Amino acid sequence: MTDQQVYSPLTLRASGLSCGRSGLVLNENLDFSLTSGECLLLRGPNGTGKTTLLLTMAGIVAPLAGRFAPERPGDEMPLLHYCGHRNAIKPRLSVLENLGFWAELNGPTGLEPEAALAEVGLARLAGLDAGYLSAGQARRLALARLLVSLRPLWLLDEPTAALDAAGHGLVARLLDAHLAKGGLAIAATHDPISLPDRAPRVLQLEGIW
């Protein structure tokens, strides 16, 4: 592990993975692997199962067949963050209180909430009720949750949704920094994501109709 690396070596493997919801098979027999420092983008039209695949990898939806499993001998750190397309913000709590809540829930093992807000450009809004945030600002707050608790795997559903060009750049920087620490990321996205120091891999999903 280098001085920059935070996470122990990790490999993710999907073997014969099939997923779907409500009896509908959306993708089947997926095989791929991902190792520390890699980013995988899930691409495909609406309805091809990108979100369902993320939920399956997060353990929220059971696979229909096959398996998705981490290989990380001896590492007891919680595995993943799942950041869905909904921001899950409490509108009557302040921006800082929202982030403090998530830090306590997931374990305050990363940045202090104030520092995380600065990283995503929300420091001046820390005392504002979160219900007053714009859509882009709310997305930045959701992304700040990734920074307050350490998890090697980030599962992101449309991370750039509602973000302007500066916000797209923020997502790229956050991802690049996470990968440089030995983390992994899998993101479902319609938007191109260009990382400063590495090229993401792409898994094109076609769905089953």
Predicted regions, residues:
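Helix-to-loop junction immediately C-terminal to a conserved catalytic motif
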Residues: 58
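Conserved ABC ATPase "signature" region
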Residues: 111-126
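Conserved ABC transporter NBD signature motif
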Residues: 62-78
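Hydrophobic anchor residue at the start of the ABC signature
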Residues: 143, 182
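Catalytic Walker B motif of ABC-type/P-loop ATPase nucleotide-binding domains
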Residues: 154-158
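Conserved ABC ATPase signature
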Residues: 129-137
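Q-loop/switch helix immediately C-terminal to the Walker
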Residues: 86, 91-107
